[in-house]
Amino acid sequence: MRTKYLIGNWKTNKDLHQALAFVEQFKQHPAKTKAVLGIAPVHVHLTEVNKVLPNNLLLLAQDANFIASGSYTGTVSYTQLQDIKVNSVIIGHSERRKYFNETAQVINQKLKACLQAGMLVVLCIGETEGQPISFLKEDLTQVLQGIDLSLLKQLVIAYEPIWAIGTGKTATPEIANNTIAQIRVYLSELYNKEIAQQTSILYGGSVAKDNIKELAQTEQIDGFLVGKASLDVNDFLVMAQVYA
């Protein structure tokens, strides 16, 4: 059985006090869930959040540079994340691609560096409105180029249709399920059927407590990468219960 996940991508939200308060409230109301729960605060809060983090909450960075050290102003490397005991990271989010012009080649380098360092990586992929689903195959082919089969056990994929991120639009359960099934076909073509069936693939894109249950009942969706709806600890705990 594939591992289920519920990961909150906080983006550039919450000050340090709010981030710590979330964790303290989370600890007071343990979630009854079979899913791996995680949060991704901004980089500057990772160290302090990690100090109060319970064992049943995974801490992720929102990005990592593929260069271990050097003259790269404004970036945080994967080795520096590991120095502060952060061993999980989101790579390739559409906002990184859109606002920071990250190409598939850059994402491939980040993915390769983080996986080779032993990190758990949540790789984001998704199409814009009007793009054919075959775009996902092209993107996967590029971002996974040169990545050894043995490293894929550390890989989680998050399918986030770009037209659904922060828009209030959500893919129907049928569309999300069928698209993720097609992603598994692409993985089997790039690697093999076993990898395709073993890899956890999440859905993201305007997921909230009001629609998560219906999405979670589909065969192919293995969890969720949630943005705005993950900022409220009570809503986060409600969403976690879909995998009770």
UniProtKB/Swiss-Prot annotation:
Enzyme class (EC, first level): isomerase
UniProt pathway annotation: Carbohydrate biosynthesis; gluconeogenesis; Carbohydrate degradation; glycolysis; D-glyceraldehyde 3-phosphate from glycerone phosphate: step 1/1
One example of a Gene Ontology biological process annotation: glycerol catabolic process
Major localization class: cytoplasm
Lineage top rank: taxon: Bacteria
Protein localization: Cytoplasm
PROSITE patterns per UniProt: TIM_1, TIM_2
PANTHER family cross-referenced by the UniProt entry: TRIOSEPHOSPHATE ISOMERASE
Name this protein carries in UniProt: Triosephosphate isomerase
